[in-house]
């Protein structure tokens, strides 16, 4: 996928467990390297459980915390970005549509007075209902 280098980008990732937890740091690193206006929003309503520690990107200190919150705060801080997350499951089309709506960047980035951001949706979910929602 080719995006113009001066267009703001918003990435919305559904799922912060086995797949999402491992790709999140790489997305933050990529956005940092691209050095363009960007947002990365991680969505997951699940909490870190002991069984997750073996195969997911969490530590014992994260137990009981929301997965999206942990990943967003950890890696946004590392790369000097704003932590954006939704500590809830995205379960209906209205909620997803609101998340992926392209926002204008007026005011926040004066170089982009009315530019619409490019939106990328990443489905890193572990259930069929959420996968189907991503394809609608």
Annotate the PLM regions.
Residues 1-136:
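Adenine nucleotide-associated cytosolic modules
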């Amino acid at each position: 996928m080719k995006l113009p280098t001066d267009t703001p980008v918003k990435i919305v990732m559904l799922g912060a467990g086995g797949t999402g937890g491992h790709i999140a740091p790489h997305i933050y690193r990529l956005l940092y390297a691209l050095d363009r206006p960007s947002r990365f929003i991680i969505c997951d309503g699940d909490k870190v459980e002991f069984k997750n520690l073996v195969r997911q990107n969490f530590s014992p200190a994260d137990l009981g915390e929301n997965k999206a919150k942990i990943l967003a705060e950890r890696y946004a801080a590392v790369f000097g970005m704003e932590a954006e997350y939704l500590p809830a499951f995205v379960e209906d089309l209205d909620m997803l549509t609101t998340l992926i709506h392209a926002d204008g960047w007026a005011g926040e980035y004066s170089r982009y007075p009315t530019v619409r951001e490019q939106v990328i949706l990443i489905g890193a979910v572990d259930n069929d209902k959420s996968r189907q929602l991503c394809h609608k």
